[in-house]
């Protein structure tokens, strides 16, 4: 009996040791920046160009009902757009994000999928702003990036009960933007709050864009669903997948956390802060705000 007891105890000890070994937590592998994220971080400083229908309506947001003819750029619009890029480079900026389509749905390029764009027959000076800015960026060595509003207050398919109709419209337009204007370094989505997160099919859209521009860094505004001051390491990513975090117009806090989770997996997400140069916080140009801009050291 003693021998049997001894063997029993030895066997139990061996099994317990195996269990402890198997269950011990592996060393945490903290996510690090990808090549694309590091390139974005290294650019550091850029210009966010808000231009479009709202510029000529003198508003921040419009509802997509203004006639296309409201958009009335000058004949030398292409030269002016190239000038924006030159000024950005002169100021030390390494990237430019252009609002190719804001919430009103008006497109700054000639899209095959809508007449609510710069090529509308009622517009006299049909300048492809996306081409003018992207060409200048490539010439000047400035990284070209695209803002595209998910929310579209003009496009009829957006109002349909079948949400996939608009997703296809959106993918068609994104294909134009990703294949006609050279390298696109960032894709900045906005307006996701107007629908349920799952209605955007973000994984599908993300994969679609990456198939054309593998190194393009993609994110959706309000990525984490919190202001930067409230973000904590390990918070859930609301708009997944995303390559970086957005929440305009706030600055990151000291010791800004970079690690966030989705379905239990950790991801490294740098924060891109966007700030207006307007004292009153306007994104688009307004005549009444033309003389009151912030200097470089004004908070």
Language model: regions and residue ranges:
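Bacterial Sec-dependent N-terminal signal peptides
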Residues: 1-29
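Mature catalytic domains of secreted/periplasmic carbohydrate-active enzymes
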Residues: 26-299
């Amino acid at each position: 009996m003693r021998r049997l007891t001894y063997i029993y105890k030895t066997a139990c000890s061996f099994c317990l040791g195996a269990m402890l070994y198997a269950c011990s937590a592996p060393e945490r592998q903290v996510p690090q920046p990808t090549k694309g994220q590091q390139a974005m971080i290294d650019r550091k400083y850029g210009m966010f160009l808000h231009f479009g229908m709202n510029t000529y309506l003198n508003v921040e947001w419009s509802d997509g009902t203004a006639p296309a003819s409201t958009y009335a750029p000058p004949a030398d619009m292409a030269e002016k757009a190239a000038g924006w890029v030159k000024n950005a480079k002169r100021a030390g900026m390494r990237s430019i994000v252009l609002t190719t389509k804001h919430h009103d749905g008006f497109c700054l390029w000639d899209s095959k999928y809508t007449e609510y764009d710069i090529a509308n027959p009622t517009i006299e000076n049909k300048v492809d702003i996306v081409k003018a800015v992207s060409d200048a960026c490539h010439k000047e060595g400035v990284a070209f990036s695209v803002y595209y509003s998910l929310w579209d207050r003009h496009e009829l398919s957006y109002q349909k009960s079948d949400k996939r109709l608009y997703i296809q419209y959106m993918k068609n337009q994104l294909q134009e933007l990703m294949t006609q204007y050279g390298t696109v370094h960032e894709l900045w989505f906005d307006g996701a709050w107007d629908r349920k997160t799952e209605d955007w099919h973000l994984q599908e859209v993300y994969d679609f864009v990456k198939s054309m521009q593998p190194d393009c860094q993609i994110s959706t505004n309000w990525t984490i669903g919190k202001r930067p001051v409230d973000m904590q390491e390990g918070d859930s990513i609301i708009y997944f997948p995303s390559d970086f975090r957005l929440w305009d117009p706030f600055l990151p806090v000291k010791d800004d956390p970079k690690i966030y989770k989705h379905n239990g997996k950790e991801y490294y997400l740098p924060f891109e802060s966007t700030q207006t140069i307007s004292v009153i916080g306007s994104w688009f140009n307004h005549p009444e705000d033309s003389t009151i801009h912030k200097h470089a050291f004004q908070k």
